[in-house]
């Protein structure tokens, strides 16, 4: 039984609604909601994932910016379970406040045009998030999960992997959506690391080092990081200044950012 409804996709909001039952079921299986958990879906759209999750779990919070979807979501959810709708831009939502002491599980088919800002916003509230299951452009998921030496290993890879375990789960083809996007999508799982295992002393300093390193990725670190690191930083961290950012492990960036010179 599918309770999703029909509504026109808005290009301005980057909307592509998932419509293929096979992939909907795979996402719900990947999330595997359990009693007592607090599920929060970002951008429910026509309810393709919303209603199967609600039917399985009984309660769900959704964050939807498109006001034209609020009433249809409310009406369709009424006979299924308890649906709480937060009508707001997701980047303005305080996930820590939404969690209210119970870590939330974030789920969503993220709008292509703001997927990276949403990921970094979720990281800002990592202490209130148990895990995340997101569908994004496959290209973005490839970057998120990439390792050193890969052509797509970059700032997004390092920033996310420093704070989360990142696992690419499966690819979703364009034909699974209405309207179909021009590229493949993929589902990814992110599990925030325990705070004690994230050894970053200064989050801003770490972000600055990573940004500078990949901002000029063809240059050696000595040149790319000239505004944020001195030669002594490399020596103390055990990082070669003649290496390039794409050659460094996440742990190398953390050590480099953590160095405090006297």
UniProtKB/Swiss-Prot annotation:
Q: Under which EC number(s) is this enzyme classified?
A: 2.1.1.182
Q: Which reaction does it catalyse?
A: adenosine(1518)/adenosine(1519) in 16S rRNA + 4 S-adenosyl-L-methionine = N(6)-dimethyladenosine(1518)/N(6)-dimethyladenosine(1519) in 16S rRNA + 4 S-adenosyl-L-homocysteine + 4 H(+)
Root EC class? transferase
SMART domains membership: rADc (SM00650)
Q: Which domain of life is it from?
A: Bacteria
Q: Could you state one GO biological process linked to this protein?
A: rRNA methylation
Q: What does this protein do?
A: Specifically dimethylates two adjacent adenosines (A1518 and A1519) in the loop of a conserved hairpin near the 3'-end of 16S rRNA in the 30S particle. May play a critical role in biogenesis of 30S subunits.
HAMAP family, sorted:
16SrRNA_methyltr_A (MF_00607)
Cross-referenced PANTHER family, in alphabetical order? DIMETHYLADENOSINE TRANSFERASE (PTHR11727), DIMETHYLADENOSINE TRANSFERASE-RELATED (PTHR11727:SF7)
**Protein name, entry field:** Ribosomal RNA small subunit methyltransferase A
Organism expressing this protein natively = Xanthomonas campestris pv. campestris (strain ATCC 33913 / DSM 3586 / NCPPB 528 / LMG 568 / P 25)
């Amino acid at each position: 039984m599918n309770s999703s409804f029909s509504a026109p996709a808005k290009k301005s909001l980057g909307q592509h609604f998932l419509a293929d039952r096979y992939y909907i079921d795979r996402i719900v299986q990947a999330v595997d909601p359990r009693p007592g958990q607090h599920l929060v879906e970002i951008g429910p759209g026509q309810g393709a994932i919303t209603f199967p999750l609600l039917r399985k779990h009984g309660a769900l919070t959704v964050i939807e910016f498109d006001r034209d979807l609020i009433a249809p979501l409310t009406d369709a959810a009424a006979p299924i379970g308890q649906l709480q709708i937060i009508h707001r831009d997701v980047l303005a939502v305080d996930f820590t406040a939404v969690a209210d002491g119970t870590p939330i599980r974030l789920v969503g088919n993220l709008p292509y045009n703001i997927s990276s800002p949403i990921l970094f916003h979720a990281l800002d509230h990592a202490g209130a998030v148990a895990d995340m299951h997101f569908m994004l452009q496959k290209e973005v998921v490839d970057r998120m999960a990439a390792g050193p030496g890969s052509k797509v290993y970059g700032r997004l890879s390092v920033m996310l992997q420093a704070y989360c375990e990142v696992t690419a789960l499966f690819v979703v083809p364009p034909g699974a959506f209405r309207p179909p996007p021009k590229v493949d999508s993929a589902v990814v799982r992110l599990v925030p690391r325990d705070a004690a295992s994230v050894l970053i002393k200064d989050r801003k300093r770490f972000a600055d080092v990573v940004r500078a390193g990949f901002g000029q990725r063809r240059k050696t670190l000595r040149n790319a990081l000239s505004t944020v690191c001195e030669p002594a930083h490399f020596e103390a961290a055990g990082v070669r200044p003649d290496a390039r950012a794409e050659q460094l492990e996440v742990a190398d960036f953390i050590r480099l950012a953590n160095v405090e010179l006297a």
